[in-house]
Amino acid sequence: MLKKLFHSALWGLAAAGVILFAVPRLNNSNIFTSDDIISFKNAVRIASPAVVNVYNRSFSSASINDNDQLQVNNLGSGVIMSKDGYILTNKHLIQNADQIVVALQNGNIFEASLVGSDDLTDLAVLKIRADNLSTIPQNSARQAHVGDVVLAIGNPYNLGQSVSQGIISAIGRNAVGDSVGRQNFIQTDASINRGNSGGALINSAGELVGISTLSIGKTANEIAEGLNFAIPIDIANDVLRKIMRDGRVIRGYFGVQSDISSSSEEGIVITDVSPNSPAAKSGIQVGDVILKLNNQEGISAREMMQIIANTKPNSKVLVTILRLGKILQIPVVIEEFPVN
C-alpha cells in the first residue's frame, strides 16, 4: 500500500513539474497587458469637467443680514449644458435657497441665478456668468438600451467629484417614489447617493444619457439596493429649452389616463377621464379607444402624452375614437397643464 502511495505521489510530482514547465509562472508575470485593462477613463475625462457642485445656502434665523452666516442647507451636482453658463440640476436641491453657489472642477466658484424650474420633472435651470465652459457631448442618434454600461458623475456627500459605474437596468419607468409619472425614468444600478442628484449619467463613450435624480434607499423595514433613477436627456433638453424661452415649462393638458396593459392593437384605451378636464368637456368617456390624434395614428400612450404636452394651450386637437363599434371624431381644446 505504501509502495503504491509512493508511486502515485511521484507521478503527481512529475505531472506538476511538466505543468510548471509548460505554463509561465503566474506569480511573477502579469497575464494582462495595459491594452487589456477595461477602463472608462476616456469617457470620464470627456465628461467630468462639465459636472459641477451645487450648494443651496440659506441665512440662519439668528443673523439674517450677516453674509458670513449663510449655511449650506442642501448640496448636489449639476451639468453644464452650454458654453455660456446654463446648467441643469434638480429642483429639490435649490428649493428655498437664499443663495445658489456653483463650483467648477477647475476650482472656480460662481453665484448662480435661477432661470426657472419644473415640478413634474424635478429639473431646474441655473445660469452663471462665464464663457467658454466645458460641455458633455450628446448623440441623439444613439438610443439607450437595457444592459448599456453607464457612469454616474457627481459630488456624493460633498466628498468631491466621484464616479460610480453600473448598467441601465430598465427604461421608461414612471411613478417612481414621490414622482407624478411624467419623467420616463432611466433605472440604473450605478450609485446615486446624496450629492449625486443633478449630476450626469453618461455612457461608455462619454455621451450624456441623463440627469441623475433620485435613489430609493432605506425604509423602515428594508434596504433597496441598486434602485437609482435619471431623467433621460431628451426630456431634460426639452425642459431646458422651454425654461430658457419662457422661464417655465408650459404643457398642454388633455385629462385622460390609459393603462398600457389594457390598450389594444387598434389604439389607446381610456381608463380614466379627469373631471372638468378638456377631455371631459368634449365628451371623451372611459372605454373609448383613441385611434388618431389629428392625423397621427398608431401612437402609443406615452407618445400621446408627449404630443399633448407639446401642444400649445387653447389649440384644438381632432381626436378620432372608437366607441361601441362606431368611429367618432371629437374636437378637443387643449388647456394648460395645472401645476398643482
From Swiss-Prot:
This is Serine endoprotease DegS. The gene is degS. The chain crosses the membrane at residues 5-24. It is found in: Cell inner membrane. Allosterically activated by the C-terminus of exposed OMP peptides (consensus Tyr-X-Phe-COOH); cleavage only occurs in the presence of peptides. Inhibited when RseB is bound to RseA. Regulated intramembrane proteolysis (RIP) occurs when an extracytoplasmic signal triggers a concerted proteolytic cascade to transmit information and elicit cellular responses. A membrane-spanning regulatory substrate protein is first cut extracytoplasmically (site-1 protease, S1P, this enzyme), then within the membrane itself (site-2 protease, S2P), while cytoplasmic proteases finish degrading the regulatory protein, liberating the effector protein. The active site is at residues 92, 122, 197. Its EC number is 3.4.21.107. It holds the Pfam family Trypsin_2. The PDZ domain probably binds peptides ending with C-terminal Tyr-X-Phe sequences, which activates proteolysis. In the absence of OMP peptides the PDZ domain inhibits peptidase activity. Residues 1-4 are cytoplasmic. The lineage of its organism: Bacteria, Pseudomonadati, Pseudomonadota, Gammaproteobacteria, Pasteurellales. A site-1 protease (S1P) that cleaves the peptide bond between 'Val-148' and 'Ser-149' in RseA. Part of a regulated intramembrane proteolysis (RIP) cascade. When heat shock or other environmental stresses disrupt protein folding in the periplasm, DegS senses the accumulation of unassembled outer membrane porins (OMP) and then initiates RseA (anti sigma-E factor) degradation by cleaving its periplasmic domain, making it a substrate for subsequent cleavage by RseP. It is a single-pass membrane protein. GO terms for cellular component: plasma membrane. Belongs to the peptidase S1C family.
